[in-house]
Amino acid sequence: DHGNKQIKTVHCSPFVSGLQQSITKPFGQSLQYRGNYYTLSNERIPFRKDKTEDDRFFVLTLIAIAEELEARQIGKQELYNIQLPVGLPPAHFGAQAKKFTDYFKRDGIVEFVYRDKPYAIRITDVVCYPQAYAAAATMLHTLMDDPKAVVLDIGGFTADYLLLKNGKADLTSCDSLENGVILLYNKIRSRGNSELDLLLDESDVDAILAGRKTSYPAEAVRLVERLAQEFVNDLFSTLRERMLDLRYSKVVFVGGGAILLRRQIEASGKVGTPLFVTNINANAAGFEYLYRLETAGR
């Protein structure tokens, strides 16, 4: 799951979609590929709708593959054959799916070194699925009797919505809104600095919204929670302008932003029946689930 904020696989902990590149081996853990060294960075790659413009998301994918092989405890092999289900926002799916799958279809064997361990992989298959739909895939059978339901994936830079009719995706009623939680982080950082002379980073905001104990004063907590509630209310108002009234339908919330903002979503009073997919890796798990269904008869 190639998020603008994080890369996620089925079994690994998410990591930030950020890379530092150098021609000499850096201190610490790194990946070596095509004569360059790469280390993970907390500084995200700037938002881009087209992630195929350079090799950075491919390098992040190599790291994800190595981490997933390790997590699955797959023993050392001379060559790993990799099947790679990936995803795109529903609104970009039709226009970008072929280009995105072609980006990962590298000819022949790809060799790299990660954490001082050599890997040789062959990507034998790449299939692309709509995000949001994939995250909700395992629960779609529970929505087959509902004439209308909405899947809302609140991510880093975007909030993707998709209408379901009797459990089936309606790709004519979907879009990707630039209403991700990074917009909220930036607003909180700016207001915290101007109003309270505080420097709040994303981990501070996450801790406050998760209800964890912090050393920040009560007015900082109130500011964060108020702006988070405004963010959620504004998002729902935007959806209503697009003729999606969430008060009278089931809404499946997925994505790290939805998990983070669950209290605000439930407090908004603007959602009839909210259903939460609490696995932050849900899109990645959904891609694998849909891929296994699709290839079961091969």
Where are these regions (language model features)?
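Nucleotide/phosphate-binding catalytic cleft detector across ATP-hydrolyzing
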Residues: 2-149, 168-182, 203-298
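Ser/Thr-glycine-rich phosphate-binding loops at phosphate-binding pockets of nucleotides
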Residues: 154-160
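Short, basic interhelical loop/turn and adjoining N-cap
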Residues: 196-200
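Long, charge-rich alpha-helical interaction segments
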Residues: 186, 190-193
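PRPP/pyrophosphate-binding module of the type I phosphoribosyltransferase fold
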Residues: 161-166
